[in-house]
Amino acid sequence: MFSKKQLKGKRETMHNSICVIRRILRDESNKGQRFRRLLMSVGWQIWKRTIAKPIVATLFNNCRFIAHPDCQVSSGVFYFRVPDSREVKVLRRWLDGGVLIDVGSNVGLFALSLADKVDHAILFEANPLVALRARENMALNSLDFEVNATALSDAQGEIYLEDRGKATVANRTLLDPATTTYPVRRVPRTTLDIFLKNRLKPIENLSVIKIDVEGHENSVIKGMSSTLTELRPKIVMFEYLQRTKFHETQKLFGAVGYRIYRLDKRNEFIEVVGQPDPLQNLFALRGDTEPQTGE
């Protein structure tokens, strides 16, 4: 007989498995290979639980990626032909060279998904282990993309980073360690404005900025106001969570001439009016930029 706790755990596992299957079947990048992706997902789960060693996978754009069994991001490489396909498809349409800045890059999968569309990329990842893996992924593809093991914020110094173990994507950047029940570590932080000011080689063509820092987005945006004003990237993609103060986000972008959009079901940009639904990626477009579709 199972205890109530064990039964609850099994129900959660079953629910999560069903959700994953639905995502695999519904993902638009899996068209024509959905059954194959289901088999690959099962194979990856078996590999994680038995062999439990890293494996090199080839992405849709022929970049190679080191998939680690303890890395949540790695699963997406097997589940989907194009991980984060909607956002990647839209950004690939916008990009034609230039520089990508990836804030909260994790192991570098997002940067690799755009690697053939940019001239250079600068990655920021506060978790030292994860930053190391990002460097390994760049080296595997002979890319000279920069990986910085530091957090971006609105000030210089140090900040706290949750340590939930392994290479989880859920670690939050915190000003006060008392706001989490997880262990924390101190990590260096700076602002994008200061980083670029001190960089020996100035950026001439900043195309896109992507931000995914688990609720610390507004602080990152505060620290890049000069960058947005002077370098004027066409688009900034950022994750929006329930705990993010969206009115503050709008104010920050509005002050430097950017408007915020979301993607509709047809991958077309719709300007955000009011409070958007949480748990989605939003896009700040330069005021003189004409929205394009992802089709």
Q: What feature does the model see in each segment?
A:
Residues 2-295:
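Phosphate/nucleotide-binding beta-alpha loop and adjacent structural elements of enzyme active sites
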